[in-house]
Amino acid sequence: MTRQIFVNLAIENMERSKAFFSALGFSFNPQFTNDKGACMVIADNIYAMLLAESFFQTFTKKPVADATKSTEVLVCLSCDSRAEVDEMVRKALAAGGTAPNAPQDHGFMYSHGFEDLDGHVWELVWMDPAAVPPQA
């Protein structure tokens, strides 16, 4: 069986979150999307389940973190180019997200990120394997 990853994130407003991520170019699997959750397709075998906070709470006995006040997780996605990193951040900002940090350029690796409408941090990274420094 092929492994899949489902990142589950608590959200406040389903339609607003779906509109935000649609503006970034993501699609949703209607088979696993309803008023309680939306299955966002990131790539083959990689998904984010955007879950209404009340529904998310049914999966844990711990309090649900307020992602606008504390960091619960950093979701990191690879990109095919520096331009793709910048374009996705641009789309996130245009859709109402924020960029909590400046881009970081390490020569062999370039990264930038955004916070979505619920405060979840999404890091985007492009790496140039040919430029990775050799191990000492």
Label the model's feature ranges.
Residues 1-16, 72-77, 128-136:
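N-terminal beta-strand motif that seeds the catalytic metal site of vicinal oxygen chelate
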Residues 60-65:
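Short beta-strand/turn micro-motifs at beta-sheet edges
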Residues 73-90, 96-100:
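Mid-chain, well-packed structural core segment of small domains
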Residues 89-136:
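Vicinal oxygen chelate
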Residues 24, 66-68, 124-129:
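Membrane-topology and secretion signals of cell-surface/extracellular proteins
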